Amino acid sequence: MSSWSMVKHRTLALVSAVATACTAATPVLAQTPGQKPNIILLVSDDTGWGDLGVYGGGEGRGAPTPNLDRMAREGMQFWDFYGQPSCTPGRAAMQTGRLPNRSGMTTVAAPGQGGGLPKGEVTVADVLKSAGYSTFFVGKWHLGEAGYAMPTAHGYDQMKDVLLYHLNAYTYGDPQSNPDWPPSIPKPVLIGELEGVAGQPYKEVRKIGVADIPTLDDGIETASRTYINAHAGDRTPFFMSINFTKNHQPTLPAPEFAGKSQVKTKYGDSVVELDTRVGRILDTIRQAGIANNTLVFYTVDNGAWQDVYPDSGWTPFRGTKGTDMEGGSRVPAIAWWPGHISPGGTSWDICGGLDLIATFAAVAGTSLPTKDREGKPTTFDSYDLSPVLFGTGKSKRNFWIYQTEDELAPGAIRVGKFKAVFNLRGDYPPFSDESHTGWRGPERYVATVPRLYDLQSDPGEHYDIFMTNWTEKSWTMPVFDAVMKQVLESYEKFPPREAQSLSYTGPIRLSQYQRLEALRQRLQSLQRGSAAAD
């Protein structure tokens, strides 16, 4: 076989594999004998991939994480797990199992914008509730302010200590944080901490200010442990979505954790706090005697926010929160279920928060719906990970889509070990002191061909190998094109919802308006001509 034939054969094989993986992500039901397990999703905020000891951080970086490290030793650790590039998209992806632009949850939900998770979106709570689960949400929601967007409007029976914003939003009106706030500009009106039950009006329990930030996770931990103890003996299984505020900027540790890290920084102390609270929740599960019937999954919403260093997590990857580079969305993930997940397991499967809804559905013995909450056809971007968890097989996913803000076409695509990067916004070399990172960087795309990285041998994305002499890999383009085609075609059948959070990023040019107006008039003319012909 000629060298060209070999390349062609290899390309066709990869394209075929992509086409198979990109088809409907229907979960294969997990074989979990006996009673349906309780399921607990633990999510921390902006925690760095390298903050945990099992990922190279922990004590070596001055902030030990013995409880999360133990969780990994007793369960399974994921190496190629992805969130999304920022908070709201990351949380929407975990709750819905859909690319954020499908739900319209593409960027950070800001105070005063209203709106939020659309009424029609199906959540993991909806799916598990239909399978007979009691459902409980506690902590950071960040999926909008509207009543129709609340957890109790999306499948959760009960919600406690609910926070609607990114943590730094609670500093906006604080005179110490913003002493130069002009009196002529009204201070933002933030909705405070909420609680409620499904079918009844929710209520604001208290307002939240800077002074409350250090102890928010204390309330989240307490509510979580109280719920576990109250429902441990139930015949009905429960699903809990527990969402900590640590380690989002500003990281202000609770008083009991001040100075407890070896590094003696607020961020380090907050890492110790997060780890301790996770450990206490796991201890509560053990003490309640339900560890063998409870799946616990820990992960993070997005990559570390390097823009706000030193008040940020650490990552060995290129880029930061808000970018399509690995640092924007590669996150730690650990699954724990004694007696079902073998201790010390590791996975290099490509997977992410998108896959949790299909995985939890499979574990619960149910499947994902074909219609949304409004009765319209829907699709999911979620792949069942239960074969990976239980050692019976691999995930059907072999690709990942990277999108920032309102990108419709992917800003980067990973297939197998190769990653093509098209969107270079906010990019900077690892460990540089470049200030224009993340959201602050200029929007820019590659001219003709993408950057190409081998993430297996170069996870830090140092070496673009697309057109280098010795490792030339331009033959991979049909592979990425196949994924791009599949994603774009899916929008025709399942159109994305209206974006829920919009703000001006500029520029809007007169020439753009004129081109759009000319196109609109041309389309109207064609429609009139078609009608006349009929």
Where would I find each of the regions flagged by the language model?
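N-terminal secretory signal peptides that target proteins for export/translocation
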Residues: 1-9
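Bacterial N-terminal signal peptides
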Residues: 12-27
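Formylglycine-dependent sulfatase
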Residues: 14, 29-450, 459-482, 486-496, ...
